[in-house]
Amino acid sequence: MIENNYYHMFANGADAKNFIISESDFIAAFNRIGVCAYSCNVTVVAASVEDTHPHVLLYGGFEQCKIFKSMYESMSLRYIGRRRDSSYAVKLKCELLKIEDDAYLKNVAAYTIVQATKDGKAIMPYDYLYGTGALYFRSPHTVLPW
């Protein structure tokens, strides 16, 4: 029987510069999260894509989450390689950390949802298009911007 746990997948933003350079890159990076989750049979609890790197809170078996990480990296690098010249090379090396306790789980969930809006962007987490904040904070009576 597979034991499911929570995992935090992320990349070091300093190493992954040029990960996103256009709106179509944001859209593709966010969509890859769903494709990988479906393909690997894991649940995405929270996610955000910043211009330098992704953050994803996953729930599933270790092997499935490890495959998710590898698939996301390889799909991202293929996407970037097909659309850019070598001057925009990207190093994308994701980490996968098992979440051991409730305090860390809450910290990762909050960080994942709000981090993309903390770097001087004049936007709230519920309005950030490339994260799951709107799914947590929007009123049921509010029409999502997308």
Please report, for each region that a protein language model flagged, where it lies by residue.
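Short Pro-Cys-Gly-centered "Cys-loop" motif that presents a nucleophilic cysteine in a tight turn
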Residues: 1-52, 59-146
